[in-house]
Amino acid sequence: MDPCECAKTGTCNCGATCKCTNCQCTTCKKSCCSCCPSGCSKCASGCVCKGNSCGSSCCQ
């Protein structure tokens, strides 16, 4: 179980280099935050941020 959690909205930090702001996320992965880009209603399963943001390819 990953020790990271984040609110439905807000800022999510996982590890030293990952920071996702205003992500619609409910859990963090150790590598980064599981989140959707703005305007994305649903993320693909297993989508993770690369750097500080997710690409539109995460959207379903």
From Swiss-Prot:
Region spans: Beta: 1-28
Binding positions for a divalent metal cation 6 per the UniProt entry: C36, C40, C43, C59
Domain of life of the native organism: Eukaryota
Assigned keywords, A-Z: Metal-binding, Metal-thiolate cluster
Keyword ATP-binding set for record: no
Listed GO biological process terms: angiogenesis; positive regulation of cell migration involved in sprouting angiogenesis; positive regulation of vascular endothelial growth factor production; response to cadmium ion; response to copper ion; response to metal ion; response to methylmercury; response to zinc ion
Family annotation (PROSITE patterns): METALLOTHIONEIN_VRT
Binding positions (a divalent metal cation 4): C32, C33, C43, C47
Binding site for a divalent metal cation 7: C49, C54, C58, C59
Entry binding sites for a divalent metal cation 5: C33, C35, C36, C49
Cystine crosslinks: none
Record SUPFAM superfamilies: Metallothionein
Stated induction or repression of this protein's expression: By zinc ions.
Record's keyword annotation contains Metal-binding: yes
Region described as Alpha: spans on this chain: 29-60
Record-listed a divalent metal cation 2 binding positions: C6, C12, C14, C25
Binding-site residues, a divalent metal cation 3: C14, C18, C23, C28
Any one Gene Ontology molecular-function term assigned to this protein's record: metal ion binding
Binding site for a divalent metal cation 1: C4, C6, C20, C23
Entry domain remark: Class I metallothioneins contain 2 metal-binding domains: four divalent ions are chelated within cluster A of the alpha domain and are coordinated via cysteinyl thiolate bridges to 11 cysteine ligands. Cluster B, the corresponding region within the beta domain, can ligate three divalent ions to 9 cysteines.
Family of the protein in this entry: Belongs to the metallothionein superfamily. Type 1 family.
General function of this protein: Metallothioneins have a high content of cysteine residues that bind various heavy metals.
Designated name of the protein: Metallothionein-2
Organism, as annotated: Danio rerio (Zebrafish)
Encoding gene, per UniProt annotation: mt2
